[in-house]
């Protein structure tokens, strides 16, 4: 059987690969018949600014994160123009806090505050009625809520009103430090609870739960140091980074179920004279881990220390790269690219940082949290 030869249209010149090496201008060439030399200018601009169609370049650059977008803009003037045109700055998170001038936490009256537009949305959550509620952690627009009476742990999404209950936490678990890796609607969600064991806290108890499981799984690990109590924890690069009250750092790997105490000395933020008057937080930005506080009391200027895992050291950032940190007990979110006056600033969960109020929220610090609004946030 004869096969028909298939023909293809000629490839457009703009899609063909050419050498990106700059060719030196040739001052002269020799003619084929050995005649006199003739001057000829030879210029090759390469692929960067001419060989990639604009719409394709914009599509590629629009898929990059902010840091990668900035790096790509350094290639040439054309890439700079297109990178800036599609650059996506991270939006400010929203603050969730009790509405004190009404019933407040006693009646389940809460507020969602959008700092970008100075808008407040008044909401009522019967499941948050009472004072014995703690917002243990916040991530991807979800809250992990702990109620002391009755003894309940559940997820709550203030933007949609969704609620997901978890199994009862095992006995002898204090639930003082709970956190999770991703939204409970994600298959990668993992919830962990830390409880120090024994009189001198030489052993740490880690309880884990994943969506679909009916019970918690309990692990016991040697803390290797006495007197360590975990009070800050974030999830980054597939690991839970756990910070103790004395500034010691440990890592829990949920996939391997391992616990390691890192040989990293506490940073300067954990000096006694700083900790007595200023809160210390831990946050994450594009895979980097930071310990942050303010430079002075009643001052929002950011003091940041970046974790260097290769050198096992916290490096103080003299200029914190224009980052803005929104801090609360439940979570601390980091943003880049905000207006100049908001860079290198640490905002607390006190509404007075944004608008003047006769009912500051610091009275309910464990009932307030910063939240990342969903992309399809049509209800607000």
UniProtKB/Swiss-Prot annotation:
Disulfide bonds: none annotated. Pfam families: Beta-prop_KIB1-4, F-box. It comes from the Eukaryota. Keywords: Kelch repeat, Repeat. Residues 47-94 form the F-box domain. Kelch repeats lie at residues 190-233, 234-279. This is F-box/kelch-repeat protein At3g18720.
